[in-house]
Amino acid sequence: PQHASRPFDKNRDGFVMGEGAGALVLESYEDAIARGARIYGELIGFGESGDANHITTPTMDGPLRAMKGAYKMAGEPKVDYVNAHGTSTPINDKNETAALKELFGGKENCPPVSSIKGQVGHCLGAAGAIEAVVCLMAMRDGVLPPTINYSTPDENCDLDYIPNQARKAEITVAMS
């Protein structure tokens, strides 16, 4: 079970159910300052989309629309890290890689990418919140989280997935 979830690995064969929760407080900067809150980050853009193609054979169109919406709303900043959905499914990981390459204008322009699903599994409804918390912690600590269980590269998933070892980096803008 420890090696069952293998995001972006050539030998991935499906997601592993996880269990977890993440919580974030979203409030105005002024309110956070007024109550003396420790501010971990700022939400500068978001996107949402549905992929109505088919539940088990999605395309990259839905995720790409969401990514483009968030990126445009944020003012198209230099992104230092992407915490990918990275479900360990052959179709999703390939489509997500293609969408990231399109968003950033090619493989050579993509920031480092990782998926935490090798560590925690797919926490379904909690996945987005957990991934946002991981982005904030990565920014706070200056550490790119690894994609664990990555051992065999896939020609369709050819980005820098931060394989197996965390990496120090300055992270100003992260995308999840």
Predicted regions and their residues:
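A general structural motif
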Residues: 77-79, 110, 171
